[in-house]
């Protein structure tokens, strides 16, 4: 009997016809197969039987029957190290290393977090709510973004966590170093996001009707002086109130404070990326209510070595911490076991 799977439409595909989306997103092997499944009543869009020409929007929930004989995917287990912050019988909290893609895609058939999870836990001990090629996956981080992620060990918990994230009940905060000195200590960026007209893998702020509401807040933690080849830097703490693809990176580009090291959203005139080959973006904090024991769990992950090496180059250019910067740095030092008080994130 074919399993029923769920899929949430990302803003990368918003505005696409349903039959095209089912094929383009890899849910069915061909567009014609997708059409047959729709017409057979085996696909539901937001709880209703759709037409093949219906348009999908970011956040739409698709329930579909798996084509077992054609879409079954067998992932090879791969012995990729995982840094596990928390584990019980229902879920995991991991600190994803930079460069690790979450699940296979046409350009990355292996070497992913999913391959690592089935090696360490076995495919039968992981949730499969997003299909057999994405065991354990509940939400994603960009491949070059490091930090804390939730993974599920069974479908029941996977669906609950997915819904909590959709409802914005999971608190996720990011550390982000951007070009230039942001003037205000706090900010709110309310700018809809849609995929780029010119490059489908790139997102942009857009006034199109299909663009999805996107809200990011930030707190400045520390500023650094200008140098010979740059206009200074600002370390910010970002929080998402929506979960659009590349949201922080797009919003920082929108306010002309590009993320340091970002190869996709960058200003060609900003020549100093402090030696980074990936964006300075790290999911450093996560807090959520455990769906089974009802305890609130929170975790903090320190900056990885490459980001520490980058920001340490600014130690002699520090202007000072903000009030929020002092709070976060104190919590960060306590979490990392740093007993000697430091005056800057560039000195940790």
Name these PLM-found stretches.
Residues 1-348:
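RNA pseudouridine synthases
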């Amino acid at each position: 009997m074919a399993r029923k799977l769920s899929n949430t439409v990302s803003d990368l595909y918003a505005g696409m016809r349903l039959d095209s989306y089912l094929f383009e997103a890899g849910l069915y092997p061909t567009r014609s197969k997708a059409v047959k499944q729709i017409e057979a009543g085996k696909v539901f869009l937001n709880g209703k039987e759709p037409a093949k020409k219906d348009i999908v929007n970011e956040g739409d929930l698709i329930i579909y029957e798996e084509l077992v004989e054609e879409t079954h995917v067998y992932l090879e287990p791969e012995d990729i190290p995982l840094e596990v912050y928390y584990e019980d019988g229902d879920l995991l909290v991991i600190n994803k290393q930079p460069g690790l893609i979450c699940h296979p895609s046409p350009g990355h058939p292996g070497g992913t977090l999913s391959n690592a999870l089935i090696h360490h836990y076995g495919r039968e001990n992981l949730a499969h709510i997003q299909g057999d090629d994405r065991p354990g996956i509940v939400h994603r981080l960009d491949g070059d973004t490091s930090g804390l992620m939730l993974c599920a060990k069974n479908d029941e918990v996977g669906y609950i966590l997915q819904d909590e994230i959709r409802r914005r009940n999971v608190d996720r905060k990011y550390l982000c170093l951007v070009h230039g000195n942001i003037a205000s200590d706090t900010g709110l960026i309310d700018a809809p996001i849609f995929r780029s007209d010119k490059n489908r893998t790139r997102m942009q702020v857009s006034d199109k009707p299909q663009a999805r509401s996107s809200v990011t807040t930030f707190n400045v933690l520390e500023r650094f002086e200008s140098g010979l080849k740059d206009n200074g830097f600002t370390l910010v703490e970002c929080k998402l109130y929506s979960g659009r693809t590349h949201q922080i990176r797009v919003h920082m580009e929108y306010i002309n404070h590009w993320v340091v090291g970002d190869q996709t959203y960058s200003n060609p005139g900003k020549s100093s990326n402090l030696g980074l080959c990936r964006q300075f973006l790290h999911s450093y904090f996560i807090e959520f209510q455990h769906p089974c024991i009802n305890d609130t769990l929170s975790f903090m992950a320190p900056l990885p070595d490459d980001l520490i090496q980058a920001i340490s180059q600014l130690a002699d250019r520090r202007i000072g911490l903000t009030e929020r910067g002092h709070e976060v740095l104190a919590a960060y030092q306590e979490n990392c076991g740093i007993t000697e008080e430091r005056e800057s994130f560039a000195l940790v």
